[in-house]
Amino acid sequence: MTNMAKVICDKLATMTFSEQCDISVDDEKYNDTVSEVLENNCFWERFPEFLSRSYALGGGVIKVYLEDNVIRLNYINADRFFPTKWNNRQITEGIFCNDYVQNGFYYKLFEYHTLQSDGVHIYHVLRRSDSRSYLGQEVPVSELFPELDYEMVFKGVQKPLFCYFKPAVGNNMVFDLPLGLPVFANSIDTLRE
């Protein structure tokens, strides 16, 4: 089944997007910026792979962040993102989870993105454990990331700094969440045959 599921996801990704696609903005200044951001983040090479994983996992997130004053894109698997607020059109707030191992400890960094009246607020919570399977206790973020503040505010920003993508497959397993399903979720028995 694994190979057939991968073939299905890869084929859908190829049908959805190819390197021949053109992304442009009417305003020349913004168009140049968008083109530069996409090029700097290997978008044309990485996006098809991201789409394939998103079809396999039921969704994915592209998160925007700054690194040394350069706009970066992070391609995140659906299982590393938990929506906390949404409307009929999009997910507007959520929590990202990243795992790290250092000095024999397992760390989980939770990054909570929330929209408030003055802009986007991002809160960081770090948890440390002796075991990979245990959530552990909260520790100061500076223990692993000395340069990272507990709270970051992007004043004036009124849109999420991420975009959630899900396959156009109705979620008939979890009705209350805006999450997608793997494109083959309803045909797993057939694929196993």
Residue ranges and their predicted role:
Residues 53, 57-59, 64-193:
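Structured, contiguous alpha/beta core segments that scaffold functional sites
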